[in-house]
Amino acid sequence: MKKKYILAIDQGTTSSRAILFDQKGHIAGMAQREFTQIFPQPGWVEHNPRDIMTSVYTTITELLNNTQIDVRAIAGIGITNQRETTVIWDRQTGQPIYNAIVWQSRQTKDICDQLTTAGYQDLVHAKTGLLIDAYFSGTKVKWILDHVENAHTQATRGELAFGTIDTWIIWNLTGGQVHVTDYSNASRTLLYDIHALRWDPDLLTMLDIPAAILPDVRSSSDIYGLTQTPYFHGEQIPIAGIAGDQQAALFGQACFEPGMAKNTYGTGCFMLMHTGKKAVESKNGLLTTIAWGLNGEIEYALEGSIFVAGSVVQWLRDGLRMFGKASDSQAYADRVSDNGGVYVVPAFVGLGAPYWRSDVRGAVFGLTRSTTKEHFIRAALESMAYQTRDVLSAMQADAGMELKELRTDGAAITNDFMAQFQSDILAVPVLRSEIAETTALGAAYLAGLATGFWSSREEITQHWAINLCFKPQMDKQQREHLYAGWKQAVAATLGFRVA
C-alpha cells in the first residue's frame, strides 16, 4: 500500500497529541487528550507515567477512528516530547518506581545548591552546555534513586531503566524491546557530554548514578524499532524520529542555517538559535544544546528557556478567574492602550534564562487605584515578550549574530496582540507559521527523512509558509521606556526574599 502519512506523537506538559501529516506537511487529522497534573508540595510538579501512556494510546485510537485511514498507509512515527521530565521504571515489569518528575519541578533545588557549593558548575557547563539547575534530568534521577527504597541497589544491578519521555514512550510502543533516546534529549539530562557525544563518567559519579540505567543515544532521524502494540491493529510501524519539543520546533520551522531562530510559546517559552556545527559557549546565561543529530553530523543551538509563558494565561483564567477562555485575553488586552504602568513578573517557579534564579517568586508592580483587570491581563501577556527580549539580547551577544526575523509557534502567539507587541519590543519582524503544530511537524519531518517519505531538508524548506508577518510599529523611545520598566521590575523581584 502507498505510504501517505507520517504520524507524530507530541507528548507535552499538560496533554498528548497524535497528529497525521501528509506529503505536503499538512495536517490530515489530530487528536488530543489532557492528563492530570500532580503537585505534592509547593514547587513540585509530577506526572503519573501510566497516565501519560494512557493519553498517548487514547489519542492514537481516537485519531485512527476519526480519520478511518488504513494503518498500513502510515510510513513511520516521529516522537517529540516535553524535555527533561524524568521516568525510572523496572525493566522486568515495566512499572515506574515513582512518578515522573516534570521539568518545571523544583524539588531537587537542594541537590543543585549542594553541587554548586561543591564547585561543580564549571565542570557541568563545560561538558553539557547547561547550568546546574533543578530544570534538568540529572538531579531528578538522583532524587528518585535516593528516595525510593532499594532503588539505587536495583539501578546498580541493571534492573531499572531511566528515560526522558521519548524513551518511556518508545519502550512501551515496542513492548519493552527498545531503550533509546536521541542526541537532543540526551543533551538535556546534565549527564551527557555534548562535545564527546557520550554519557560522561565524571557527571555520573558527581550524581552517583549507575550507567546501567541509561538508554542508547542515537541520531534524531533513524529507525529505532517497530511498534508492538494492538493500538496499530497489529501492524509493525517504524518509529523513526525523535527530538525534544524545542529542537523539534526548530526543525519544523525549517531553521536549518546558522543565525536562524524560533520561539515557541507554550507552557514555557523557548527560544532557539541555530549555530551550525559549532557549539557556541554562552557567557550570558544561555544554554548550549544539541539541536539534532542527522546524517552522521551533530548540529548545535543556543537556547533561552523561560519557565512561565503561556501558563501565565492559565493562571489568569484558572487561578484569578479573570476570564473564561484563554483566547479571551486578547480582547481584554486590546481594551486599554497601554499597561497602565503595571508589570507582572511571572516567576512562579523561579526565573530561567538569562537569570537562573530558582529562589525567586512572582511579583506585580505598579498597581494604583486606577489599575483595571484589563491592565493586569495586558501586563501579564507583555511579560512573555519582555522575557523573550531578555533572551534575545543574550543570544545575539553570545552568537555575534543579529536576528533578522523571529519564527514563532505555540498557542500564545496565536494571540494577535501578543504577536504584535513581541515584534514591537524586539524591533524585528515576527513570523507566525501557517502550521501551528510545528513541534509535531518537526518530529514528523525527522521520521519522514529516515523512512524516505521526504527526500531532503531542501524539500522540507519548500513546505514552510507564513500565516502572518507582524512588523515593528512602536517607536524606539517608547520601546526602550517600556523595557526599562520591565528591567526595574525584574531587579526588584530578584531582591525580594520570602520570609
From Swiss-Prot:
Pathway: Polyol metabolism; glycerol degradation via glycerol kinase pathway; sn-glycerol 3-phosphate from glycerol: step 1/1. PROSITE patterns: FGGY_KINASES_1, FGGY_KINASES_2. It catalyses: glycerol + ATP = sn-glycerol 3-phosphate + ADP + H(+). GO terms for molecular function: ATP binding; glycerol kinase activity. Glycerol binds at R83, E84, Y135, D245, Q246. ATP binds at T13, T14, S15, T267, G310, Q314, A411. Signal peptide: none annotated. It comes from the Bacteria. Its EC number is 2.7.1.30. Sn-glycerol 3-phosphate binds at T13, R83, E84, Y135, D245. ADP binds at T13, R17, T267, G310, A411, N415. GO terms for cellular component: cytosol. Inhibited by fructose 1,6-bisphosphate (FBP). PANTHER family: GLYCEROL KINASE, SUGAR KINASE. Belongs to the FGGY kinase family. Key enzyme in the regulation of glycerol uptake and metabolism. Catalyzes the phosphorylation of glycerol to yield sn-glycerol 3-phosphate. This is Glycerol kinase. It comes from Xylella fastidiosa (strain 9a5c). The lineage of its organism: Bacteria, Pseudomonadati, Pseudomonadota, Gammaproteobacteria, Lysobacterales.
